[in-house]
Amino acid sequence: MAMTKRNGKNDTIILNTIEELVPQDHDVRMLDNCIDWSFIYPLVENLYSDVGRPSIDPVVLFKMIFINIIFGIGSMRKTCREIQVNLAYRWFLGISMDERVPNYSTWSQNYIRRYGDSEVFEEIFDQILKQAISYGFVDMETVYGDSTHQKANANKNKYTDEEVEIMKKIYENDLLDEINRDREEHGKKPIKKNEKEELNFDEETGKLKRDIQTKHIKISKTDSESGCFHKGEKEKCFAYSHQIFCDRNGFVLASVCVAGNVHDSVSFFSAYKVLNDKYMDQIKNVCLDAGYITPAICKTILENGQKMYAPYKRPMTKKGYYKKYEYVYDEGYDCYLCPNNKVLSYSTTNKLGYKEYKSNPKDCENCPLRGRCTSSKNFQKVVTRHVWEEYREEVMDEIRHTPEWKEIYPRRKESIERVFADCKEHHTLRYTRLRGLQKNQHQSLMIFACYNLKRMSRWRWKSISKTAQNLIKSTILNYFKKKEKRYLFISTTLSTI
């Protein structure tokens, strides 16, 4: 076969509409078909003035963000350039060929002047999720929770080391009440609440001393609201952490953004509150990983009438020493028995919520198992037990061994882990170009809203296509059934000849 060389010409005149040129199975048609985009107008109506020159349609602005995230473009400047030459994007936005595409800075100025201090992003996220629920795509009987980090727009080598106050945990007051109740039962004095800060002055320098717990953290010079993230073998960097919950079908139900140095077990409570405020009555099971197995989290979930499903957590003890589960707790006598059958009696309940059980030094001094039990110089073994330990034991020793656990927990890898993988790979969750916690919270809501919308649109499109195919099949079958009946009628009729 001879080689052919074509001299391309770009002066062809095409007499077609944009509607005809956009393929029927293109993603933008799925997105446009699954939801009525006019729902945005009531959400932003109070952010616009009743007088003045006409603005750019807010639906067009938000659709540009959806194009930016769903198709993984990332940059708004690049998104505007893509819209100029992409007929499918123009069709989705409702912009004709001779109409000018909005400038990339238009969205930035609208965010600064209108949308930044509003709740429109959360409302859009909720509206898309409600639409998915109305289609029957969301199953909230079991929810899956986890967090992932997103690298911040900050140099990891430019930071200052600062001393900051340790923030009070959300359950600290309830924990203190439980500690004092336990101490009073054992004849101990209750721990006082630090409701008012006492002013103490140093006798030598005369400076004010504050009775506040502090810690040293690294604060970025570029983005001070991000946090230094360092976990296992992952690269040490400044990042933001996204705590989310999704259903078994992968639809994101709630999302909260925090600094990257906040532990998952701390950010859990804010995201769990957002989830429960909306869907508490529908949730029966909460599935989490090993990082969330704390007495406070177990207590919170179980007291809400929900079951917590979590994996086995390896004991964090020194190599060569007895594990904590090898010390048997006697609930009746409120004591522990060591592997040598010696009693560890209750001593006190500390301010962290742990009851301390101590052995008799005389029993430990000549014990043949002391080398595997304790290395203390005073020959005394101390075992601690949290005041809410029974909730953790219910999760780890009872629920974890049920048949439901074997069905629910393995689905984590195909639900919430899939959400993180898709959003990082296709929807700009791996890095952020924005600086500041509020901006990244808004961005994360839009990313997960786009993820829900894309998932809903494809499921909706498949269901419509399947319905159409079934209708065609039933029509064809009915046609042949009628033909068959007619043939049978003719063949069974007696001849008059």
Walk through the language-model features, giving the residues of each.
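Hydrophobic alpha-helical membrane-insertion signals
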Residues: M1-R29
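A short, ordered amphipathic alpha-helix with a cationic face
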Residues: K5-G8, R53-S55, M97
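A general alpha-helix detector
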Residues: T17, L43, V60-F66, T106, ...
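Amphipathic alpha-helical interaction elements
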Residues: E19, P23, D32, D36, ...
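Basic, short loop/linker segments at the boundary and entry of helix-turn-helix/winged-helix-like folds
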Residues: Q24-F66, F71
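Anion-binding and metal-coordination hotspots
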Residues: G72-V85, I95-I497
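Short arginine-rich
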Residues: R90-G94
